[in-house]
A protein has these predicted regions:
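Substrate-binding cleft of extracellular glycoside hydrolase catalytic domains
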Residues: 1-114
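Catalytic domains of cell-wall/extracellular-matrix polysaccharide-remodeling enzymes
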Residues: 81-158
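Acidic, Ser/Thr/Pro/Gly-enriched interdomain connector segments
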Residues: 7, 203-244
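Sec/Tat-exported extracytoplasmic proteins
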Residues: 27, 46, 74, 108-112, ...
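Conserved hydrophobic/aromatic packing and binding residues within compact polymer-binding modules
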Residues: 254
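Acidic/polar residues in short coil/turn loops that connect beta-strands
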Residues: 243, 265-266
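Functionally critical loop-and-helix segments that line ligand-binding/catalytic clefts
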Residues: 1-17, 133-210
Length: 278
């Protein structure tokens, strides 16, 4: 799915005419700031049928105060949106303390019963152990170049991995996206969930230690396929170039890997993911 994330910088954006499967909207920052245009943006997103998320930008002012401010602000929309925590270095006095971030994730889950996504730069994924955060779905960001672009189903990422996570569920690949219906820059994202899987996060029906990972079949094109290709190649099941495209060579190598583990389906389902983790 293709989508955007917005804040007060996109005040007045008409989400009815900007093409996107989903939109993630800044709600709050710190213990008192509410993003300008938040209520209008989230109300319109829901009214025009967009899959919708909201995020809080952490600033280190105190876990309880930040989470309380976030949850009280988004309360009218709580059962309709996914929740995200934005963890960046700018205007965040606790950025070097990854345990503060993990405490915020746990506090959001405790107050809402829902599992929040964690947004951060891909490089930050590798800076800390993230013992607890790794159990929360990752929304990672990395840009190859700052040139205007539109959606792509195969965004660039480096080969350094995502630290404690195998892959992100949402990936932000540009801050200078250009889409019809809006004349200025937009953050562009790709989401590797299905619409139903997204909705399960809005309802709080996902288990913390069992993040959704998609079923992969012949013809699929995404970063999950690329990760499997890299894994197969690294473990002696050569499938050629790790291009993110699930073709015949990838399927043949996968079948050999599965046969060596007592199964053979030719696609990546939950059993294959579980075997990969074991």
């Amino acid at each position: 799915m293709n989508g955007i994330d917005i804040s007060g910088h996109q005040k007045g954006i008409d989400l009815a005419i900007v093409p996107c499967d989903f939109v993630i909207i800044k709600a709050t920052q710190g213990v008192s700031f509410i993003s300008p245009d938040f209520q209008r943006q989230v109300t319109q997103a829901l009214s025009v049928g967009k899959l919708t998320g909201v995020y809080h930008y952490a600033n280190g002012a105190g876990v309880e105060g930040e989470v309380t401010h976030f949850v009280s602000t988004i309360a009218p929309y709580l059962d309709k949106v996914i929740l995200c925590l934005d963890w960046e270095g700018d205007q965040n006095s606790k950025f070097a303390d990854y345990r503060y971030c993990e405490a915020m994730l746990e506090a959001i889950k405790a107050k809402t019963g829902k599992i929040p996504f964690l947004y951060m730069s891909k490089s930050v994924c590798r800076q800390y152990k993230w013992e607890k955060a790794r159990n929360y779905p990752l929304w990672a960001a990395q840009y190859k170049k700052q040139a205007p672009t539109t959606y792509t189903d195969k965004p660039w990422t480096d080969s350094k991995g995502f630290g404690a996570w195998s892959n992100p569920l949402i990936y932000q690949y540009s801050s200078v996206g250009r889409l019809s219906g809006y004349k200025n820059n937009l953050d562009l994202d790709i989401c590797y969930l299905t619409p139903d899987e997204w909705i399960s996060y809005t309802k709080g029906t996902q288990d913390l230690l069992q993040p959704v990972r998609p079923t992969l079949r012949r013809g699929d094109k995404n970063e999950y396929v690329r990760a499997w290709q890299e894994y197969l190649n690294a473990n002696g099941y050569c499938c050629g170039n790790a291009d993110g495209i699930f073709g015949q060579k990838t399927q043949d190598s996968l079948v050999k890997w599965q046969q060596d583990r007592g199964m053979e389906s030719g696609y990546v389902g939950q059993k294959s993911w579980e075997l990969l983790d074991s």
